[in-house]
Amino acid sequence: MKLTQLILEKRNKPKLVVMAGGSGTGKSYLLNQLDLGSLHQVNPDKYVEDPNSPAYNKLSPGVALANKEAEALADDKTSFVWDTTASNPDKIKLFLNKGYDVYMVMVYTHPVIAYLSNAKRKRQIPATAVFSTWRNVYDLIDKYNKMLKGNLSIFVNTRGGEFDKYVKEFNTAAKNGAAGISDYLENLNKKEKIGGSSFRDPYKMSDQEEQEFYNAVKNIDYDVNDYSEDRALKKYFTDWYRKKGEGPGDDKMKQRLASHRSGKERDQVRHKQALDDIADMLFDPLFQAKLLHSTPAEIDKKVQKFLS
């Protein structure tokens, strides 16, 4: 194959710019400083914030619809910008396999800045998701750099020092691993009156279903004030009731409760591991050395060259 043909094929390849990073890192802030307005933009927020969307105020369905939109664009070989956590490298590899040139702009911020920024947003994801995503994304820096053959820029977002006090406190707590971080966050939540998630909607039941449910749980020892426990039982009961016209009975309800609690315990173990990993990463000089900051102007220059 002639060199000119190779050059033409490369120029005709569709381009994907990935804005990577977890919730509260400032991806939108950086994107607004890059000259990418001519490219189609894929963002789960479009679906989550639209009252007419089936994913309105539902994070996971919003992400699923955004992923579906991105895959449809790939089928048409359309160049676009994708706002995503990038916590799953297989999804990025999918576009490489479809013939895309990919450039990743990874927005990094300290975990407590991400946590506090998320808490100030109108739409807040659970704290466990903030920290697990933080760990998962930034643990992939080397992998992405290799996969994309150096087409990776990192923007270290310090928010102008606004959160320096909290960064120092968090780092001190992190010296005691997950336990230290958990204690710090508990106190921080009380002090700042934050925590929780805006995606926690009450489970919708008809009046009759609700009456039948409360009759069915009279002998079930569960925590009605525990959102996830209450929702899990209501969903299980309602699905069964709508299908069979009656409740599942005490034994099955108790089994569902036990299953939910076991899953919650596993989630707590995973969350503790994520916090331990974060503590290790913060004090790991090899990890810190990977955070090679580029300014918005420097990133834009590299991205424009990539797109040309």
Indicate where each model-derived feature is located.
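Conserved GTP-binding G-domain of TRAFAC-class P-loop NTPases and closely related GTPase folds
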Residues: L116-V224, L282, L286
